[in-house]
């Protein structure tokens, strides 16, 4: 009788485990989406100006919103001034997951 109760409790716990894990994966995916606004267009608007080295400014903006692993791949960006003291950063060779 005790064995049956233990088996039943174990089955219930294992049935709850996958739903708990999938919720964690979903929240992780939402965090990634918030940190990676660049994909799929590979463009994003930031405040500021392009300055003397707009490409580097855009790359710095990219790195501040992207996973550190992006630094392992070569990325070049273009900076285009926009109205209201904004810049459009375009990084066409960036690899999106």
UniProtKB/Swiss-Prot annotation:
Report the InterPro entries cross-referenced here. SCRL (IPR010682)
Coiled coil regions in record: none
Q: Which GO terms describe its biological process?
A: defense response to fungus; killing of cells of another organism; signal transduction
Keyword Secreted listed? The answer is yes
GO CC terms: extracellular region
Where, subcellularly, is it found?
Secreted
Q: Which cysteines bridge via disulfide bonds?
A: 39-96, 50-79, 58-89, 77-91
Keywords linked to the UniProt accession: Antimicrobial, Disulfide bond, Fungicide, Plant defense, Secreted, Signal
Tissue localization of expression: Flower buds and roots.
- Annotated signal peptide: 1-24
* Family per record: Belongs to the DEFL family.
The protein depicted here goes by the name Defensin-like protein 245
Organism listed in the record: Arabidopsis thaliana (Mouse-ear cress)
